[in-house]
Design a protein with these regions (language model features):
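Bacterial N-terminal signal peptides
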Residues: 7-15
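Positively charged n-region of N-terminal signal peptides that target proteins for export
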Residues: 1-7
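A structural boundary/capping signal
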Residues: 22-402
Length: 402
């Protein structure tokens, strides 16, 4: 088991020191696990910069000036060294900042102070972040050039700033509650934030649980024991709805991959490509219960492939993402993602088209329906209700382009 120890010294007034990994525990050391890595830092609560006044631009400016006089650069340096060593995507790096801020200023103790610490650490890590306040709420935004849905954003100087903490409030009526931006200039905070997740943490073997997944393929039962990590749910709890290009390329973690993909490949041995894709289509269709996001989560939630394996239910978008991932990993065939007004499905390009073909840019793709329907649809069969419906090709995967 590989555990990297990251020593953070957060003595915000008395000074900061970075010690070698795996130092002896001592009084005042705080230790927490960050998805398989042990993070340790020294922190004296008496050195914390307080924020007890009302929400105002003046009080936030005072907080910024006070914390800027502390030896925060060593803290940020260690955070960035972690980023350089482990190469987490921005979303994972933000989770590290959240956990570090929680150790300094617990969220339940003082939400405003906790949010300001997150904003400060993210800004000093080079990201273009900003704040907006109403009479009693504080919103934390980060600049992003990507298409992000279902959460608020602000525009400033032609740039989009996406809210990072909207989930903490549930919902806000922005017509009734007015927010004012607190635009504090932070030097070198110019980097745009990316919501793309291209890798998951290494985790530790002990973090995984084994889940039995089964389905029936033409009168034969197939059983899988898949290793899954519940922490993946935590990583994506507040993850927003992103565009399909980002969403469909979120990978499996290594343990989950190694417990599922080789087993699928073994079962596919001896099948031709068409039958193999049919097998993967039916695995995705019948190994999981169907439930709409609004019923399961109360809102739209696009799940990553590993989340679909973790949860007991999923909708058409979730299954499309899992099926896409499996076909990509095992056969690496060209695919297009079709978005209908109330449905999402996948079409695969075979050597020769099968059944109902979708023509896109001169190529013919065969529809493969990974979501259970009233009829037992074969490869190349489109839902009858969709034959006259308009659709949009929202993502194109061409192996030659990767």
């Amino acid at each position: 088991m590989k555990i990297a120890a990251l020593i953070l010294s957060l003595a915000l007034i008395t000074g900061v020191s970075v010690q070698p990994a795996f130092t002896q525990n001592h009084e005042g050391a705080v230790r927490f696990n960050f998805y398989g890595d042990t993070v340790v830092f020294d922190f004296d609560p008496a050195t914390r910069v307080e924020f007890d006044g009302p929400l105002s631009a003046e009080n936030i400016q005072s907080f910024y000036e006070a914390i800027s006089k502390t030896d925060y650069k060593a803290i940020v340096s260690v955070l960035l060294k972690y980023k350089e060593q482990h190469k987490p995507d921005d979303w994972l790096f933000y989770q590290l900042i959240r956990k570090a801020a929680q150790q300094i200023s617990p969220k339940a103790e003082n939400y405003g102070r906790y949010t300001l610490y997150k904003w400060f650490l993210l800004s000093k890590s080079g990201y273009d972040a900003t704040l907006a306040i109403s009479n009693h709420r504080i919103l934390f935004y980060v600049q992003s050039d990507e298409n992000i849905y279902n959460i608020p954003f602000r525009m400033r100087d032609g740039k989009q700033y996406v809210c990072l903490n909207y989930h903490d409030y549930g919902s806000i009526d922005f017509d009734k509650e007015k927010f004012t931006e607190v635009a504090i200039k932070t030097p070198d905070a110019q980097k745009a934030f990316s919501y793309k997740v291209t890798s998951l943490p290494g985790f530790t073997t002990a973090d995984y649980e084994e889940k039995d997944i089964s389905f029936n393929y033409y009168q034969t039962d197939y059983h899988f024991k898949v290793k899954l990590n519940p922490q993946v749910k935590t990583i994506f709890t507040n993850y927003p709805v992103v565009d399909y290009a980002s969403y469909f390329n979120i990978p499996l973690s290594k343990e989950t991959y190694s417990s599922l993909i080789p087993s699928l490949k073994k079962n596919l041995k001896g099948m031709n490509t068409k039958n193999g894709v049919d097998y993967l289509m039916r695995f995705t269709r019948y190994a999981f219960l169907f439930e709409k996001d609004t019923d399961a989560f109360g809102k739209e939630k696009r799940m990553s492939p590993e989340e679909t394996l973790l949860y007991g239910q999923s909708d058409c978008e979730d299954r499309a993402a899992l099926f896409f991932y499996l076909v990509k990993e095992i056969y690496n065939l060209p695919m297009i993602v079709l978005a209908y007004p109330k449905h999402v499905t996948i079409a695969v390009k075979f050597d020769k088209p099968i059944g109902h073909a979708i023509v896109y840019n001169g190529s013919k793709y065969s529809v493969c329906e990974p979501t259970p329907q009233r009829d037992d649809l074969q490869v190349g069969q489109l839902l009858p209700d969709l034959k006259k419906s308009s659709y949009e090709v929202v993502y194109v995967y061409n192996p030659q382009a990767y």
